[in-house]
């Protein structure tokens, strides 16, 4: 199987390295990368030349920043290329569902940790249980705090900012609502780590429109975890 990885950042490079252990992998990026057993092609994926190149692959993994995600996913579907997508695009990727079906494409959107792995875990839980409320709490924390932010972006910094500014969809008392990102701050105390905070973020869009059993769950919310005080600092920065 020939796989194209679109975007060779921290996450894209890791995915490429892991997949290269079993498959033929090529990374498309705007700079040359040195990855073992992985070919890198320096190319602007928004150009026509890319559309000719991508036809030679069985599947693509879209690891581009969110602002590029929807356009590239749309292009892949039009070219009948199946895709796993981890880009945090602001657009509703489900609008491309009909075209993907028509073109016999398999598309797995929002396939990161959360959304992504969290969706799979919840799918497994609700298959055998009646659930009243689900709260997803997820976040990447640096081992060493580095004031004042006490944070290090594990993926595209642009998309980290998106987490803080994009209105968060949630389900409360059976109704889908939209809340301000960084709101509804929760305090946590995690063994071995200590006190943390969590605030609402927009990671539920595909989950809210997936398994029919989800519609029967009255309350469903996603929170992003950070060290205490982070949300307040970001709020001040945004203002």
Indicate residue ranges for each PLM-predicted region:
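Hydrophobic/small residue at the entry helix of a nucleotide-binding pocket
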Residues: 11
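NAD(P)-binding Rossmann-fold cofactor-contacting core
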Residues: 23-36
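Conserved Rossmann-fold cofactor-binding substructure of NAD(P)-dependent oxidoreductases
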Residues: 45-56
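ADP-ribose/adenylate-binding Rossmann-like module
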Residues: 75-93
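C-terminal catalytic/substrate-binding lobe primarily of soluble NAD(P)-dependent oxidoreductases
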Residues: 127-239
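Conserved N-terminal Rossmann-fold NAD(P)-binding element of oxidoreductases
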Residues: 3-7
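N-terminal Rossmann-like NAD(P) cofactor-binding module of classical short-chain dehydrogenase/reductase
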Residues: 58-62, 83-85
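Rossmann-fold NAD(P)-binding glycine/threonine-rich loop
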Residues: 87-109
């Amino acid at each position: 199987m020939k796989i194209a990885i679109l975007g060779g950042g921290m996450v894209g490079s890791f995915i490429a390295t892991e997949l290269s252990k079993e498959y033929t992998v090529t990374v498309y990026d705007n700079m040359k990368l040195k990855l073992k057993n992985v070919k890198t092609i320096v190319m602007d994926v928004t150009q026509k030349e890319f559309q000719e190149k991508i036809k030679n692959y069985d599947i693509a993994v879209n690891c581009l920043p969110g602002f590029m995600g929807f356009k590239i996913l749309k292009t892949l579907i039009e070219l009948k290329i199946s895709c796993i997508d981890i880009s945090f695009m602001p657009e509703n990727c489900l609008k491309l569902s009909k075209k993907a079906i028509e073109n016999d494409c398999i598309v797995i959107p929002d396939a990161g940790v959360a959304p992504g792995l969290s969706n799979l875990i919840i799918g497994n839980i609700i298959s055998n249980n009646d659930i009243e409320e689900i709260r997803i709490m997820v976040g990447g924390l640096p081992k060493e705090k580095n004031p004042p932010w006490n944070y290090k972006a594990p993926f595209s910094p642009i998309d980290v900012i998106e987490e803080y500014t994009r209105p968060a969809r949630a389900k409360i008392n059976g109704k889908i609502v939209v809340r301000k990102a960084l709101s509804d701050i929760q305090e946590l105390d995690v063994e071995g780590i200590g006190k943390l905070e969590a605030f609402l973020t927009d990671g539920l869009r595909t989950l809210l429109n997936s398994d029919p059993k989800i519609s029967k769950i009255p309350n469903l919310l996603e929170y992003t975890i950070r060290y205490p005080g982070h949300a307040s600092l970001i709020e001040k920065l945004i203002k």
